[in-house]
């Protein structure tokens, strides 16, 4: 079920705008990079519920990583219901970006794609910069040139920023807080942020930066610390795992629910003027606090299972991130709905169910219970 030419995957809804025409007369059309990721899947659901037609750009390798959007899938041959469509493209391939902009003719473009793992960015800094920083520049230039060629100046662009850009700057961090990135990923996000500001000021693009603080969900990748914890809690509770290896337990983060945060992305593009916004819960918690809630929720003591592994410490740590989202709350009318403990318990519940299904396969001999490396 991969993308072929125009489409071969599609999502639920009713009606379908013409892919080669300006579909704004029928409904709004959104183009999303990173659609198979955590944020992309929640944003797709949100926009479909708003009546949008959603187009996602995916890489060839994404064919094996579509589980977050599989539940939205509808056979594209059912044109009356299919409103999510996937196309092959890559932020490292400028020609593919411009080609799909010309074909899809979206009203809104959401750039969510990235090599988004901070620790991994130290291992592959060149690739991280190419996708996160230069990739954003390629997409901005594709939007600018598309507008110049077609006159479709109403297109709106959203750039996914990150609280990691603030790095070692003391909290609380707002839109006016200086950036001090502490990783190749964060530095690349800073470049993408300023490219977006530059295209807004130089070319008049309606381009917004969303500086989103950490946002989690049951769809979070398992190599991120929050999901790594809740996945382990589920497996330990079910008897598939005994130990969890982590790094810095005193790192403090402002954690929110990804489903809440994608609404803020959309809200930014509904304003009369483009601007940049911090999106955060304005509460911070340490990794240790996350452990206490997650393990305590299932009646376990995290100290009996967690071991420190120096491999998971970053070369340059970011100690404390806590956002000041007063601007987003005042201007956009946005506020988080899911609190910290509710978020942690939501993730644990999902991972316990996942561990139960895994145990069935282990007990039947179809797979081995893999201890965390």
Residue ranges of model-derived segments:
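N-terminal Rossmann-like NAD(P)+-binding domain of SDR-like oxidoreductases, especially those catalyzing
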Residues: 2-215, 265, 269, 336-338, ...
């Amino acid at each position: 079920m991969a993308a072929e030419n125009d489409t071969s995957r599609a999502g639920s809804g009713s009606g379908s705008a013409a892919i080669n025409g300006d579909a704004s007369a029928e409904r709004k059309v959104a183009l999303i990079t990173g659609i198979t990721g955590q944020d992309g899947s929640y944003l797709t659901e949100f926009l479909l519920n708003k009546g949008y037609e959603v187009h996602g750009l995916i890489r060839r390798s994404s064919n094996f990583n579509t589980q977050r959007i599989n539940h939205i899938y509808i056979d594209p041959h059912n044109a009356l219901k299919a409103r999510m469509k996937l196309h092959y493209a890559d932020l490292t391939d400028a020609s593919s970006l411009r080609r799909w902009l010309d074909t899809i003719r979206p009203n809104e473009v959401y750039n969510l794609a990235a090599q988004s793992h901070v620790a991994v960015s130290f291992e592959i800094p060149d690739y991280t910069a190419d996708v996160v920083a230069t990739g954003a520049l390629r997409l901005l230039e594709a939007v600018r040139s598309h507008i110049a060629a077609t006159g479709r100046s109403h297109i709106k662009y959203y750039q996914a920023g990150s609280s990691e850009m603030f790095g070692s700057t003391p909290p609380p961090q707002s839109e006016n807080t200086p950036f001090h990135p502490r990783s190749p990923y964060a530095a690349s996000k800073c470049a993408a942020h300023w490219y977006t500001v530059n295209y807004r000021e130089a070319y008049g693009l309606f381009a917004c930066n969303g500086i989103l603080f950490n946002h989690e969900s049951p769809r979070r990748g398992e190599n991120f610390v929050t999901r790594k914890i809740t996945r382990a809690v589920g497996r330990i509770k079910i008897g598939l795992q005994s130990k969890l290896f982590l790094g810095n337990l005193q790192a403090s983060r402002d954690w929110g629910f990804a489903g809440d945060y994608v609404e803020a992305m959309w809200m930014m593009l509904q304003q009369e003027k483009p601007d940049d916004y911090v999106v955060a819960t304005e509460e911070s918690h340490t990794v240790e606090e996350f452990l206490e809630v997650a393990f305590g929720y299932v009646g376990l003591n995290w100290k009996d299972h967690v071991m420190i592994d120096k491999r998971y410490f970053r070369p340059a740590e970011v100690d404390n991130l806590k956002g000041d989202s007063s601007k987003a709350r005042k201007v956009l009318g946005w506020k988080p709905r899911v609190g910290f403990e509710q978020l942690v318990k939501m993730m644990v519940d999902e991972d316990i169910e996942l561990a139960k299904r895994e145990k069935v396969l282990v007990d039947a001999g179809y797979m081995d219970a893999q201890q965390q490396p």
